[in-house]
């Protein structure tokens, strides 16, 4: 049996994947250890990340996220370990029998020896079910009923199968009957194509976009796997925190707890300090930062009556408790506990990021002590509209007013912890006239930056609590959350997909004859080639052997022989030979695709799809008629199914995008997508930043979406040969034009232009609490190099960036204040930061 070094069991996901990737990709440094993890991750992600071993035993993984067509960490979910032979064989047998798309060539020999059983099974097969567990066991021909029941239960939990339990004649449990789940992707596509013949293309772009931008987007990639992508992906994603896809493993458990009204015991281990603790909590909300890359769970903690937060990526395990069990264990008045939770929920709009107050203990026991912040900056809304727009889009829950006569803008916001705003406020240094509530803090900060003195910021709040042993004993162990097993599951692995494809090919009617070992190997190699972008470095070596063992050991094929003419130097002298051969035990129609036509959509896939169909941007990809048809189909087939509660995952620092700009994008985006898919140019008119108008013929190259900015830009080649970037919301009109000529050349020109715009900046920072974690997480989407001098306790980080992003990099680095030092004070970013700090010091001195 092949050794699966690139596969990881669901129980080891955190240890083998998430934490190792946090070290290699997020932090960018790792001492010599865990070589197996390094090799495993390199094998899975080598095509996407720049893996390098630096002198001094530093390992490093880096990437430019804007150059990636897809999230590389979604690949991790396709390498879930399974029990060889037995599990994939049972999966293929069961779906083939229940689907109605396959027919058995002959009943198993053991069945044919029992005439009564044979007649019963022939009737069941002719009627297409229902199938009892005993029926499936007899037809599959291997294993025990208990083992098969357990495996069928696993598939039922996914939603791929449905179990109907009958009552026994004496009141006990009777037979269990099995049928296939509610809806396949093929049915979904047929529903859409009844509305629009191009629906499959529309659905593909819909899934390509939402698979990269919605939480739990890996479910969208599973749907794309089923659909089968064609053509190049039209999207790129600017400074995307792809790493957050690994947090979905824990997020789905917490979402399930919130939906079901369950308490959680969270086992938590900090990634940098390695502090281990466990807490009891009532989960309230998940927060993701589009600016800094970190994710948090906000929750109510009952022992300290507190609204608090934890980094989502540092949660190792979640255990669930019924509400009544926790209330009994706490021994508190129900009204008091309910009031605490209500106050904690009401505080959420006042949490700027993740800090819930300067003091966390008992902050939910009474009305919270909120802080009023009034930021007044120098801003001429007419002469500097970009500053006005920035303040409006980044104000979160605050209100902004402008005084045109004074040339100022004022943001008023109420928060739990005003100090948490400090990194964002630094980006306005050089303009701040006053900041009520933080004036002394900012004045000290500016003085430290001007003097170049390193400054360690203390995290707000930060109490370290532990679930008391007494309460832990009263509550018991709880039930381990397992919703993540529906996300990281072998059914979605690339191994299963290739096995299913080969199985369908062997079963197709036009290929009903026996095939030799060499012919089977050719089929396997063809399937590997079709999935080559999904393979790990070891897949093509380990899978062929295992696939043959699955087919034979799982009774999916029957042995036989076939006559073939032996290969000779002279084809006329080849002699006929009888050689061993195999044939599928099933028959199916040619062209059948197992995951599209046979395997029903899982519960999580359906719920995620329902949530995506309700998103505000879906009209960019699907017409109203297409959306209504899909929503009606979901209601018809799955009436009890609710959309996945993605509204509980909040992108806290996402910019406000004007409704009228979104409406413009919805009007022009379908035309641009059609041009990209059909290889055509566009005739468009564009409103420039300074109220000008530009019209012409443009060749679309790629669409770039920023989750932080919540907007699309397009890269085009203009009719004069210039490579331009246009905001889609500024396009006034667009029409499909003639077929593109020279698109490949224009794409090469755009790539060369991007290469010419690379710049780099190097900063250093001390090994102080959480600073390395914050900086390296925020800059994880950029290509970078990081090293650590243990003797000096100092990190050196070199960031690569595009010249057009120099302002963005400047603002981000300013957020760390005196915590960082530029190695080259003459660098343009260092000079700009110094200029702003000097100007701010002058303003505070007036």
Question: Which stretches of residues belong to each language-model region?
Answer:
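Bulky hydrophobic/aromatic content
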Residues: 4-37, 42-50, 91-123, 127-133, ...
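Core beta-strand-centered patch of the WYL/Sm-like small regulatory domain
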Residues: 3, 7-18, 30, 223-375, ...
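Short, Lys/Arg-rich nucleic-acid/phosphate-binding segment
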Residues: 57-65, 164-176
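Polybasic (Lys/Arg-rich)
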Residues: 7-12, 22-26, 337-523, 560-565, ...
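Basic, short loop/linker segments at the boundary and entry of helix-turn-helix/winged-helix-like folds
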Residues: 72-91, 485-490
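Alpha-helical residues within the helix-turn-helix
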Residues: 138
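Long, low-complexity, charged/polar intrinsically disordered regions in eukaryotic proteins
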Residues: 21-82, 460-478
């Amino acid at each position: 049996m092949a050794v699966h070094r690139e596969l990881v069991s669901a129980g080891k996901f955190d240890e083998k994947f998430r934490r190792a990737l946090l070290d290699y990709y997020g932090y960018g440094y790792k001492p010599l250890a865990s070589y197996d993890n390094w090799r495993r991750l390199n094998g899975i992600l080598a095509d996407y990340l720049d893996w390098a071993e630096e002198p001094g035993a530093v390992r490093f993984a880096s990437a430019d996220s804007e150059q990636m067509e897809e999230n590389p960490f979604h690949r991790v979910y396709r390498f879930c370990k399974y029990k060889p032979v037995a599990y994939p064989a049972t999966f293929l047998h069961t779906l083939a029998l229940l689907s109605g798309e396959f027919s058995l060539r002959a009943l198993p020999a053991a069945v044919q020896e029992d005439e009564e059983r044979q007649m019963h099974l022939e009737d069941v097969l002719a009627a297409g079910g229902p199938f009892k567990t005993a029926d499936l066991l007899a037809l599959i021909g291997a294993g025990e009923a208990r083992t098969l029941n357990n495996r069928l239960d696993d598939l039922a939990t996914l939603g791929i199968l449905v179990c109907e339990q009958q009552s026994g004649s004496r009141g006990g449990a009777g037979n269990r009957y099995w049928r296939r789940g509610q809806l396949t992707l093929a049915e979904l596509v047929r529903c859409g194509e009844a509305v629009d013949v191009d629906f499959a293309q529309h659905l593909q772009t819909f899934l390509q976009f939402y698979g990269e931008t919605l939480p739990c987007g890996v479910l969208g990639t599973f749907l794309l796997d089923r659909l089968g992508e064609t053509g190049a992906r039209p999207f790129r994603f600017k400074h995307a925190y792809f790493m957050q896809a690994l947090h979905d493993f824990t997020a789905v458990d917490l979402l399930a707890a919130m939906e079901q009204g369950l308490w959680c015991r969270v086992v938590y281990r900090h990634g940098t300090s390695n502090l281990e603790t466990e807490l009891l909590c009532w989960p309230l909300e998940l927060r993701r930062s589009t600016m800094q890359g970190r994710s948090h769970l906000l929750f109510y903690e009952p022992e300290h009556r507190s609204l608090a937060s934890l980094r989502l990526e540092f949660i190792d395990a979640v255990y669930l408790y019924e509400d009544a069990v926790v209330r009994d264990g706490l021994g508190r008045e129900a009204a008091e506990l309910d009031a605490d939770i209500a106050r904690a929920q009401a505080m959420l709009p006042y949490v700027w990021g993740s800090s819930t107050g300067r003091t966390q203990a008992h902050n939910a026991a009474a009305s919270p002590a909120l802080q009023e912040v009034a930021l007044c900056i120098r801003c001429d809304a007419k002469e500097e509209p970009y500053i006005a727009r920035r303040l409006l889009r980044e104000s979160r829950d605050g209100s902004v007013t402008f005084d045109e006569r004074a040339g100022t803008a004022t943001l008023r916001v109420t928060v739990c912890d005003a100090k948490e705003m400090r990194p964002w406020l630094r980006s306005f240094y050089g303009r701040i006239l006053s900041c009520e509530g933080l004036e002394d803090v900012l004045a000290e900060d500016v003085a430290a930056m001007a003097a170049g003195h390193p400054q360690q910021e203390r995290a707000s709040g930060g109490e370290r609590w532990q679930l008391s042993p007494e309460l832990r004993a009263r509550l018991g162990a709880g039930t381990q959350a397992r919703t993540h097993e529906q996300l990281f599951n072998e059914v979605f692995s690339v191994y299963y997909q290739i096995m299913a494809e080969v199985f369908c090919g062997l079963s197709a009617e036009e290929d009903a004859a026996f095939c030799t070992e060499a012919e089977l190997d050719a089929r396997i190699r063809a399937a590997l080639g079709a999935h080559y972008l999904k393979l790990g470095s070891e897949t093509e070596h380990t899978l062929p052997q295992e696939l043959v063992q699955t087919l034979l050991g799982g009774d999916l094929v029957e042995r036989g022989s076939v006559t073939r003419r032996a290969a000779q130097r002279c084809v006329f002298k080849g002699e006929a030979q009888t050689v061993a051969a195999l044939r599928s035990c099933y028959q199916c129609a040619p062209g059948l695709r197992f995951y599209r036509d046979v395997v029903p959509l899982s519960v999580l896939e359906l719920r995620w799809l329902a949530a995506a169909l309700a998103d505000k941007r879906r009209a960019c990809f699907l017409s109203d008629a297409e959306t209504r048809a899909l929503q009606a189909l979901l209601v018809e087939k799955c009436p009890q199914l609710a959309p996945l509660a993605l509204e509980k995952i909040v992108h806290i620092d996402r910019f406000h995008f004007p409704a009228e700009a979104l409406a413009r994008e919805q009007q022009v985006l379908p035309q641009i997508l059609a041009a990209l898919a059909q290889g055509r140019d566009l005739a468009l008119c564009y409103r420039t930043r300074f109220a000008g108008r530009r019209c012409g013929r443009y060749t679309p190259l790629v669409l770039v979406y920023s989750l932080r900015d919540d907007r699309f830009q397009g890269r085009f080649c203009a009719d004069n040969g210039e490579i331009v970037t246009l905001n889609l919301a500024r396009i006034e009109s667009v029409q499909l034009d003639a077929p593109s000529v020279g698109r490949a050349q224009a794409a090469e020109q755009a790539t060369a232009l991007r290469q010419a715009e690379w710049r780099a900046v190097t900063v250093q920072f001390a090994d102080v609490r959480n600073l390395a974690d914050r900086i390296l997480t925020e800059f994880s989407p950029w290509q970078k190099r990081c090293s650590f001098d243990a003797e000096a306790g100092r990190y050196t980080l070199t960031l690569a960036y595009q010249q057009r992003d120099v302002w963005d990099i400047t603002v981000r680095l300013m957020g760390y204040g005196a915590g960082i030092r530029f190695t080259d004070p003459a660098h343009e970013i260092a000079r700009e930061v110094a200029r702003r700090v000097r100007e701010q010091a002058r303003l505070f001195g007036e």
